[in-house]
């Protein structure tokens, strides 16, 4: 399992919790956004920058996510696409 983060709109408190959880559970967390987001150096944390444009980060996540992966997003259409691929979804509020 990997954690995919729709990082364009993730609040700082949620980002910090995702990072701590990924490191505690030794789970890869991939943050996807159209601009870089500062992450601490860790082999478990990856920042993926996609081109600017409507739903580019969402499209990338849907292309890459595998059944059993977890995504963190507040985007309902993205969540639906992830569920269709067998992924799991949480909002930044749980």
Could you describe each region identified by the protein language model?
Residues 1-94:
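Nuclease catalytic cores that cleave nucleic-acid phosphodiester bonds
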């Amino acid at each position: 399992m990997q954690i995919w983060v729709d990082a364009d709109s993730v609040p700082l408190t949620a980002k910090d919790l995702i990072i701590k959880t990924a490191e505690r559970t030794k789970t890869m967390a991939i943050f996807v956004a159209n601009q870089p987001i500062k992450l601490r150096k860790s082999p478990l944390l990856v920042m993926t920058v996609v081109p600017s444009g409507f739903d580019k980060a969402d499209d990338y996540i849907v292309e890459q996510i595998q059944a059993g992966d977890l995504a963190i997003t507040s985007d309902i259409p993205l969540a639906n696409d992830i569920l269709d691929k067998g992924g799991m979804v949480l909002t930044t509020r749980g």
